[in-house]
């Protein structure tokens, strides 16, 4: 089986004071830099459908209402190399038209250029899912790609 689309084509990260976040059609990834040597028991992470909270050593790093809903039971977090916490959230709405413009409702918004690149990437990922025999990992997209690109579902085959 081939590597996931984001591994072949890269991601479009949105930088934050604590790390970065990025998204695919189905998931939102949050990468938080923590002090080297951090242990799992130092981490308090709460994941709900519309809320996320992360504290390390009692210090709140991230807390708020998510931009859109996620499937709470599928959210996970891991401590990697004792210096980064990765949170993976599964989107409830999994299509290219559901490109999050920010991580939280009022914080960590992608600037217009990053938002544009995120939308392009999600549209390409949508095309890859619809056409599994083609490799879109090195493709560029232009034209009508906002809101997931054109809808070809009602065209005759």
Curated annotation (Swiss-Prot):
Subcellular location: Chromosome, Centromere, Kinetochore; Cytoplasm, Cytoskeleton, Microtubule organizing center, Centrosome; Cytoplasm, Cytoskeleton, Spindle pole
One Pfam match: CS
Residues bearing the modification Phosphotyrosine: 145
Gene3D superfamilies: 2.60.40.790, Single helix bin
Top-level taxon: Eukaryota
Statement: the UniProt record of this protein carries the keyword Metal-binding: no
Modified residue annotations for Phosphoserine: 142
Protein name, UniProt field: NudC domain-containing protein 2
Signal peptide: none
GO CC, alphabetical: centrosome; cytoplasm; kinetochore; spindle pole
Oligomer status and interactors: Interacts with LIS1.
Predominant localisation class: nucleus
Keyword Cytoplasm applies: yes
Modified residues (N-acetylserine): 2
UniProt KW keywords: Acetylation, Centromere, Chromosome, Cytoplasm, Cytoskeleton, Kinetochore, Phosphoprotein
Region (Disordered): 134-157
GO biological process, one term: protein folding
Listed InterPro entries: CS_dom, HSP20-like_chaperone, NudC_fam, p23_NUDCD2
